Amino acid sequence: NANTASTTSSDCLDASAGHYVDSTAGTAQTTQTACIAGTYNANTGSTTSSDCLDADAGYYVPTTGQTSQTECAAGTYQASTGQSSCIDADAGYYVPTTGQSSQTECAEGTYQSLTGQSTCIDADPGYYIDAGGSSDQIPCALGTYQPDAGQTSCLDADPGHYVDSTAQTTQTACAAGTYQASTGQSSCNVADAGYYVGSTGQTSQTECAAGTYQASTGQSSCTDADAGYY
């Protein structure tokens, strides 16, 4: 009670919620003390600082004299008690809901490049993510492709096909006159002289038949021998 003319104990005021009056300092107190940031007190008439409660993990109290704690927002967390703020989720992690005491690693196939996020992002087609907690996606290498989002690996180009640049979503069939016997290749082989490849997407070249020839490489057919030749 700060008034000088008070005559009874009823003129003394209870400490407000969010505050206390320290009984160890003796009677005749004229002020109350606010609970510090990171603590709160919902009750009136408190007589000790221990009546101010630490904020729970997953919660915070940002300023002094508070009557309640506040949940950490989605995208943030707080592992410790008695804190005045929450922590942004790291890149590669997320916090999906409020009041959380920990962050969660982005799963394989997903990533998050920013801090303080509540979700992770699927890898784009043409990209992959092969480890948890990733902050970026990885482009598919030459000879590989990925048509789908959210994948952990890329697909090797099939025999008869190739992928000649990174981050591709499709493979390309070898053109007529070329072939590819192996998987995961970035180019096709040109048919040798004396051979041909008659259609697209082939895995081998074909020898010119008797009575035909081919002097050039990379051809899709052979030429009949002229009259008088074989």
Model regions and ranges:
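Disulfide-rich, cysteine-dense extracellular ectodomains and adjacent flexible linkers of secreted
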Residues: 1-230
